[in-house]
Amino acid sequence: MAFSPANSFLINKSICESKEVEPLEANLFGKLHNKLLICKAKKENLEKKLAYQMMYSKLLKSLPKLSSLEENKLTKLKAPIEDMENTKKELEEIRKQSTETELRYLKSLSNTLSFGTLSLSNEINKVGPSASFMLKEVHDSVQVLEQRLEKMGLIEKPSESSESSIYSILASLKHTNDSLQKKELSPHEIAESPSSHSTSPMGRNVDTETLSFLLIDWQRLCAEQNTFLRDITNNMSSSVPQDVLSQLRQFFFRSELLSDKLSNLCSES
Protein backbone atom coordinates (compact mmCIF):
# COMPACT_ATOMS: atom_id res chain seq x y z
CA MET A 1 0.00 0.00 0.00
CA ALA A 2 1.46 3.33 -1.03
CA PHE A 3 -0.36 5.34 1.65
CA SER A 4 -1.44 4.53 5.16
CA PRO A 5 -5.25 4.48 5.44
CA ALA A 6 -5.35 7.65 7.55
CA ASN A 7 -3.12 9.68 5.25
CA SER A 8 -4.80 8.37 2.12
CA PHE A 9 -8.25 9.34 3.40
CA LEU A 10 -7.04 12.76 4.53
CA ILE A 11 -5.40 13.61 1.22
CA ASN A 12 -8.30 12.35 -0.86
CA LYS A 13 -10.74 14.22 1.36
CA SER A 14 -8.72 17.42 0.88
CA ILE A 15 -8.81 17.02 -2.89
CA CYS A 16 -12.47 16.09 -2.80
CA GLU A 17 -13.45 19.09 -0.69
CA SER A 18 -11.42 21.64 -2.62
CA LYS A 19 -13.13 20.56 -5.82
CA GLU A 20 -16.53 20.82 -4.11
CA VAL A 21 -17.33 17.15 -4.59
CA GLU A 22 -19.54 15.84 -1.83
CA PRO A 23 -17.54 13.63 0.56
CA LEU A 24 -18.80 10.10 1.15
CA GLU A 25 -18.73 10.40 4.94
CA ALA A 26 -20.41 12.92 7.21
CA ASN A 27 -17.79 15.20 8.78
CA LEU A 28 -17.14 18.76 9.83
CA PHE A 29 -16.69 19.85 6.23
CA GLY A 30 -20.05 18.37 5.31
CA LYS A 31 -21.82 20.31 8.06
CA LEU A 32 -20.04 23.54 7.18
CA HIS A 33 -20.79 23.01 3.51
CA ASN A 34 -24.50 22.46 4.22
CA LYS A 35 -24.62 25.56 6.42
CA LEU A 36 -22.93 27.51 3.65
CA LEU A 37 -25.53 26.30 1.12
CA ILE A 38 -28.33 27.39 3.43
CA CYS A 39 -26.79 30.83 3.98
CA LYS A 40 -26.35 31.35 0.26
CA ALA A 41 -29.91 30.21 -0.48
CA LYS A 42 -31.32 32.59 2.13
CA LYS A 43 -29.10 35.42 0.91
CA GLU A 44 -30.20 34.95 -2.69
CA ASN A 45 -33.83 34.80 -1.65
CA LEU A 46 -33.57 37.99 0.44
CA GLU A 47 -31.82 39.80 -2.40
CA LYS A 48 -34.67 38.88 -4.72
CA LYS A 49 -37.24 39.81 -2.09
CA LEU A 50 -35.68 43.24 -1.54
CA ALA A 51 -35.46 43.86 -5.28
CA TYR A 52 -39.13 42.90 -5.56
CA GLN A 53 -40.12 45.18 -2.67
CA MET A 54 -38.26 48.17 -4.09
CA MET A 55 -39.79 47.69 -7.52
CA TYR A 56 -43.24 47.11 -6.03
CA SER A 57 -42.90 50.25 -3.91
CA LYS A 58 -42.02 52.22 -7.02
CA LEU A 59 -45.13 50.91 -8.77
CA LEU A 60 -47.29 51.64 -5.74
CA LYS A 61 -46.27 55.29 -5.84
CA SER A 62 -47.53 55.51 -9.40
CA LEU A 63 -51.11 54.69 -8.46
CA PRO A 64 -53.60 57.46 -9.10
CA LYS A 65 -55.10 59.10 -6.03
CA LEU A 66 -57.64 56.71 -4.57
CA SER A 67 -61.01 57.59 -3.17
CA SER A 68 -61.76 57.01 0.49
CA LEU A 69 -63.76 53.91 -0.46
CA GLU A 70 -60.62 52.37 -1.97
CA GLU A 71 -58.37 52.97 1.04
CA ASN A 72 -58.92 49.44 2.33
CA LYS A 73 -57.70 48.03 -0.96
CA LEU A 74 -54.65 50.30 -0.84
CA THR A 75 -53.84 49.07 2.67
CA LYS A 76 -53.88 45.48 1.43
CA LEU A 77 -51.72 46.37 -1.57
CA LYS A 78 -49.07 47.82 0.75
CA ALA A 79 -48.63 44.44 2.47
CA PRO A 80 -45.59 43.29 0.41
CA ILE A 81 -43.50 46.32 1.44
CA GLU A 82 -44.44 46.55 5.11
CA ASP A 83 -41.30 44.70 6.20
CA MET A 84 -38.91 46.21 3.64
CA GLU A 85 -36.67 47.76 6.32
CA ASN A 86 -36.54 44.43 8.14
CA THR A 87 -35.63 42.76 4.85
CA LYS A 88 -32.67 45.13 4.48
CA LYS A 89 -31.44 44.38 8.01
CA GLU A 90 -31.93 40.64 7.59
CA LEU A 91 -30.08 40.69 4.27
CA GLU A 92 -27.14 42.56 5.79
CA GLU A 93 -26.94 40.01 8.61
CA ILE A 94 -27.20 36.95 6.34
CA ARG A 95 -24.51 38.38 4.04
CA LYS A 96 -22.18 38.71 7.00
CA GLN A 97 -23.11 35.24 8.27
CA SER A 98 -22.58 33.73 4.82
CA THR A 99 -19.13 35.31 4.52
CA GLU A 100 -18.11 34.17 8.00
CA THR A 101 -19.34 30.62 7.33
CA GLU A 102 -17.45 30.44 4.05
CA LEU A 103 -14.34 31.77 5.76
CA ARG A 104 -14.53 29.06 8.45
CA TYR A 105 -15.06 26.48 5.73
CA LEU A 106 -12.04 27.67 3.74
CA LYS A 107 -9.85 27.92 6.84
CA SER A 108 -10.68 24.31 7.71
CA LEU A 109 -9.99 23.31 4.13
CA SER A 110 -6.65 25.13 4.12
CA ASN A 111 -5.60 23.39 7.35
CA THR A 112 -6.64 20.00 5.98
CA LEU A 113 -4.75 20.58 2.75
CA SER A 114 -1.66 21.65 4.71
CA PHE A 115 -1.77 18.56 6.90
CA GLY A 116 -2.53 16.34 3.92
CA THR A 117 0.44 17.76 2.00
CA LEU A 118 2.76 17.17 4.95
CA SER A 119 1.44 13.62 5.22
CA LEU A 120 2.08 13.15 1.52
CA SER A 121 5.65 14.40 1.91
CA ASN A 122 6.25 11.79 4.62
CA GLU A 123 5.23 8.96 2.28
CA ILE A 124 6.37 10.37 -1.05
CA ASN A 125 9.10 7.75 -1.41
CA LYS A 126 6.53 4.95 -1.23
CA VAL A 127 4.39 6.30 -4.04
CA GLY A 128 6.66 5.72 -6.98
CA PRO A 129 5.35 6.71 -10.44
CA SER A 130 2.05 8.04 -9.05
CA ALA A 131 3.81 10.75 -7.03
CA SER A 132 3.61 13.37 -9.78
CA PHE A 133 -0.11 12.68 -10.27
CA MET A 134 -0.87 13.06 -6.56
CA LEU A 135 1.17 16.25 -6.31
CA LYS A 136 -0.62 17.70 -9.34
CA GLU A 137 -4.00 16.92 -7.75
CA VAL A 138 -3.03 18.62 -4.48
CA HIS A 139 -1.57 21.58 -6.38
CA ASP A 140 -4.83 22.01 -8.33
CA SER A 141 -6.78 21.82 -5.07
CA VAL A 142 -4.70 24.63 -3.58
CA GLN A 143 -5.30 26.76 -6.67
CA VAL A 144 -9.07 26.27 -6.36
CA LEU A 145 -8.83 27.34 -2.72
CA GLU A 146 -6.85 30.46 -3.65
CA GLN A 147 -9.35 31.40 -6.36
CA ARG A 148 -12.23 31.25 -3.91
CA LEU A 149 -10.33 33.39 -1.41
CA GLU A 150 -9.45 35.88 -4.14
CA LYS A 151 -13.14 36.28 -5.03
CA MET A 152 -13.83 37.10 -1.39
CA GLY A 153 -10.99 39.62 -1.29
CA LEU A 154 -9.23 37.60 1.40
CA ILE A 155 -5.94 36.95 -0.33
CA GLU A 156 -3.59 39.68 -1.49
CA LYS A 157 -2.03 37.93 -4.45
CA PRO A 158 -2.63 34.28 -5.42
CA SER A 159 0.35 32.11 -6.22
CA GLU A 160 1.18 32.06 -9.93
CA SER A 161 3.49 29.08 -9.71
CA SER A 162 2.62 26.10 -11.88
CA GLU A 163 5.14 23.92 -10.07
CA SER A 164 3.55 21.01 -8.23
CA SER A 165 6.38 20.17 -5.86
CA ILE A 166 5.89 19.67 -2.13
CA TYR A 167 7.88 22.85 -1.46
CA SER A 168 5.79 24.92 -3.88
CA ILE A 169 2.50 23.61 -2.50
CA LEU A 170 3.48 24.27 1.12
CA ALA A 171 4.68 27.77 0.18
CA SER A 172 1.31 28.51 -1.45
CA LEU A 173 -0.57 27.20 1.57
CA LYS A 174 1.57 29.29 3.93
CA HIS A 175 0.76 32.36 1.84
CA THR A 176 -2.93 31.46 1.96
CA ASN A 177 -2.92 30.94 5.73
CA ASP A 178 -1.01 34.19 6.31
CA SER A 179 -3.57 36.09 4.21
CA LEU A 180 -6.45 34.52 6.14
CA GLN A 181 -4.91 35.53 9.47
CA LYS A 182 -4.42 39.16 8.39
CA LYS A 183 -7.91 39.79 7.13
CA GLU A 184 -10.72 41.05 9.34
CA LEU A 185 -14.33 40.58 8.34
CA SER A 186 -16.41 43.72 8.03
CA PRO A 187 -20.20 43.95 7.65
CA HIS A 188 -21.36 44.12 4.07
CA GLU A 189 -23.43 47.11 3.09
CA ILE A 190 -26.42 46.52 0.90
CA ALA A 191 -25.71 47.76 -2.59
CA GLU A 192 -28.64 49.72 -3.91
CA SER A 193 -28.81 51.44 -7.23
CA PRO A 194 -29.78 55.15 -7.21
CA SER A 195 -32.86 54.34 -9.25
CA SER A 196 -34.26 52.15 -6.48
CA HIS A 197 -35.25 55.26 -4.51
CA SER A 198 -36.38 57.28 -7.46
CA THR A 199 -39.39 59.49 -6.80
CA SER A 200 -39.89 60.55 -10.39
CA PRO A 201 -43.39 59.90 -11.77
CA MET A 202 -44.00 56.76 -13.77
CA GLY A 203 -44.57 56.92 -17.50
CA ARG A 204 -47.98 55.34 -17.00
CA ASN A 205 -50.37 54.77 -14.10
CA VAL A 206 -50.58 51.24 -12.78
CA ASP A 207 -54.09 50.13 -11.88
CA THR A 208 -54.96 48.45 -8.60
CA GLU A 209 -56.09 45.27 -10.36
CA THR A 210 -52.61 44.74 -11.81
CA LEU A 211 -51.03 45.14 -8.39
CA SER A 212 -53.61 42.80 -6.88
CA PHE A 213 -52.56 40.02 -9.24
CA LEU A 214 -48.91 40.68 -8.42
CA LEU A 215 -49.76 40.52 -4.73
CA ILE A 216 -51.30 37.07 -5.20
CA ASP A 217 -48.14 35.89 -6.98
CA TRP A 218 -46.02 37.32 -4.19
CA GLN A 219 -47.98 35.57 -1.43
CA ARG A 220 -47.82 32.23 -3.23
CA LEU A 221 -44.07 32.52 -3.76
CA CYS A 222 -43.48 33.45 -0.12
CA ALA A 223 -45.39 30.38 1.04
CA GLU A 224 -43.34 28.12 -1.25
CA GLN A 225 -40.10 29.79 -0.21
CA ASN A 226 -40.78 29.18 3.49
CA THR A 227 -41.53 25.51 2.82
CA PHE A 228 -38.34 24.95 0.81
CA LEU A 229 -36.06 26.77 3.25
CA ARG A 230 -37.58 24.80 6.14
CA ASP A 231 -36.85 21.57 4.28
CA ILE A 232 -33.22 22.62 3.86
CA THR A 233 -32.88 23.59 7.54
CA ASN A 234 -34.23 20.21 8.63
CA ASN A 235 -31.51 18.52 6.56
CA MET A 236 -28.50 20.47 7.86
CA SER A 237 -26.92 17.40 9.43
CA SER A 238 -26.86 15.50 6.16
CA SER A 239 -26.43 16.18 2.47
CA VAL A 240 -28.94 18.64 1.07
CA PRO A 241 -31.46 16.65 -1.03
CA GLN A 242 -31.24 17.27 -4.74
CA ASP A 243 -35.02 17.60 -5.05
CA VAL A 244 -35.00 20.41 -2.48
CA LEU A 245 -32.28 22.23 -4.39
CA SER A 246 -34.25 21.70 -7.58
CA GLN A 247 -37.36 23.18 -5.98
CA LEU A 248 -35.34 26.15 -4.78
CA ARG A 249 -34.04 26.74 -8.28
CA GLN A 250 -37.61 26.64 -9.58
CA PHE A 251 -38.67 29.13 -6.91
CA PHE A 252 -35.83 31.48 -7.80
CA PHE A 253 -36.69 31.13 -11.50
CA ARG A 254 -40.31 32.05 -10.84
CA SER A 255 -39.15 34.91 -8.65
CA GLU A 256 -37.04 36.20 -11.53
CA LEU A 257 -40.03 36.01 -13.86
CA LEU A 258 -42.05 38.04 -11.38
CA SER A 259 -39.24 40.58 -11.11
CA ASP A 260 -39.16 40.83 -14.91
CA LYS A 261 -42.90 41.45 -14.91
CA LEU A 262 -42.42 44.30 -12.44
CA SER A 263 -39.50 45.73 -14.40
CA ASN A 264 -41.54 45.73 -17.60
CA LEU A 265 -44.34 47.61 -15.88
CA CYS A 266 -41.88 50.19 -14.59
CA SER A 267 -40.26 50.70 -17.99
CA GLU A 268 -43.47 51.04 -19.98
CA SER A 269 -44.44 54.52 -20.98
From Swiss-Prot:
One of its GO terms (biological process) is mitotic cytokinesis. Residues 181-191 have a biased composition (Basic and acidic residues). Keywords: Phosphoprotein. Residues 181-203 are annotated as: Disordered. It comes from the Eukaryota. GO terms for cellular component: cell cortex of cell tip; cell division site. Residues 193-202 have a biased composition (Polar residues). The modification Phosphoserine is found at S200. This is Uncharacterized protein C16E8.08. The lineage of its organism: Eukaryota, Fungi, Dikarya, Ascomycota, Taphrinomycotina.
